[in-house]
């Protein structure tokens, strides 16, 4: 039997000024699901990094769009960020991504790759697929003992 979930899908222009819309939407969804404040802040950073990577690298000078899909499950939130722009070989890049030596001065940190390192560190799971463009699937599980819910959580089941 397939696991039940609800889906929210958004498309925005791949421009820096629209990344905040995705971040705010994700924070609202995560809050209603019952995620703790710190987990929401981590997810905000991760989704910002994923979208910023698309804005900076996927379309170069062209204007494309970012597709964001939120999968709301009983125990987790899955966030997919996708583009149809220029792809890159994640396997070769992953070997160059963190961890970083904390004893080295900040001037010696690489300029590229920190976003993927942050996403990988802040989320519970990350998968990256690249065919026609790039798709980043990030997962964060709800830690029930830390739930700070000010209302009723979103149900992933229809009540009718």
UniProtKB/Swiss-Prot annotation:
One Pfam family this sequence matches: HATPase_c_2
Superkingdom of the source species: Bacteria
InterPro entries: Anti-sigma-factor_SerPK (IPR050267), HATPase_C_sf (IPR036890), RsbW (IPR010193)
First-tier enzyme category under EC: transferase
UniProt keywords, alphabetically: ATP-binding, Kinase, Nucleotide-binding, Serine/threonine-protein kinase, Transferase
UniProt-listed Gene3D superfamilies: Histidine kinase-like ATPase, C-terminal domain
Catalytic reactions of this protein: L-seryl-[protein] + ATP = O-phospho-L-seryl-[protein] + ADP + H(+); L-threonyl-[protein] + ATP = O-phospho-L-threonyl-[protein] + ADP + H(+)
CDD domains per record: HATPase_RsbW-like
Keyword Kinase appears in the UniProt entry: yes
Enzyme Commission designation: 2.7.11.1
GO function terms (MF aspect): ATP binding; protein serine kinase activity; protein serine/threonine kinase activity; sigma factor antagonist activity
Residue ranges the record marks as coiled coil: none
Described purpose of this protein according to its UniProt entry: Negative regulator of sigma-B activity. Phosphorylates and inactivates its specific antagonist protein, RsbV. Upon phosphorylation of RsbV, RsbW is released and binds to sigma-B, thereby blocking its ability to form an RNA polymerase holoenzyme (E-sigma-B).
Family in the record: Belongs to the anti-sigma-factor family.
NCBIfam families: PRK04069.1, rsbW_low_gc
Name of the featured protein: Serine-protein kinase RsbW
Organism: Bacillus cereus (strain G9842)
Gene: rsbW
């Amino acid at each position: 039997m397939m696991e039940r979930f609800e889906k929210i899908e958004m498309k925005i222009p791949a421009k820096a000024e629209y990344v905040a819309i995705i971040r705010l939407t994700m924070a609202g969804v995560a809050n209603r699901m019952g995620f703790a404040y710190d987990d929401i802040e981590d997810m905000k950073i991760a989704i910002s990094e994923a979208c910023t990577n698309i804005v900076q690298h996927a379309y170069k000078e062209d204007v494309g769009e970012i597709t964001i899909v939120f999968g709301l499950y009983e125990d987790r939130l899955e966030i997919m960020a996708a583009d149809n722009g220029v792809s890159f070989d994640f396997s070769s890049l992953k070997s160059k991504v963190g961890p970083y030596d904390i004893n080295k001065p900040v001037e010696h940190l690489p300029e590229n790759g920190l976003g993927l390192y942050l996403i990988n560190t802040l989320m519970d799971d990350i998968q990256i697929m690249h065919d026609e463009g790039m798709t980043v699937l990030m997962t964060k599980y709800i830690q029930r003992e830390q739930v700070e819910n000010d209302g009723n959580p979103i149900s992933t089941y229809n009540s009718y």
